[in-house]
Amino acid sequence: MKSLLLPFTLVAATIAAPAFAECTAPIFTVTVPDGAKATKEVMVAAQKSIKELNTAVTDFTNCLLTERDAKIAAGGDNLNDAARQKIAAEYTTRNNAAVDKLTKIADKFNLEVRAFKAKQPQG
């Protein structure tokens, strides 16, 4: 009888195991052009890349929130407040790192946009 229960137990454990999707951070490969030298087309292309990166960071944030909530829910009553806070902090740290990288790129781009506008003829 035990030999029959073991396979069913393994199947039940596998089905009940929470499936955590691994949230993959965006790849930050956007090159910010030199606004004093760049053409309008180059600046527009960089802006488009930054907008796409912003969307990727937003998607990453949403994935992290879903994964965090699933992990906390899977812990159920076995998690105390400290354990829940630790899980939340891990996901917050990952999210903040991505947002900080995006912010640095956006800030640099904004400086280069000012340089680009400054070189344009006044009319």
Q: What do these predicted regions represent?
A:
Residues 1-7:
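Positively charged n-region of N-terminal signal peptides that target proteins for export
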Residues 7, 11-18:
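N-terminal signal peptide c-region/cleavage motif recognized by signal peptidases
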Residues 15, 23, 48, 55-58, ...:
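Alpha-helical structural elements
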Residues 19-73:
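Immediate post-signal-peptide N-terminus of mature secreted/exported proteins
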Residues 67-123:
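Compact alpha-helical subdomains of small soluble proteins
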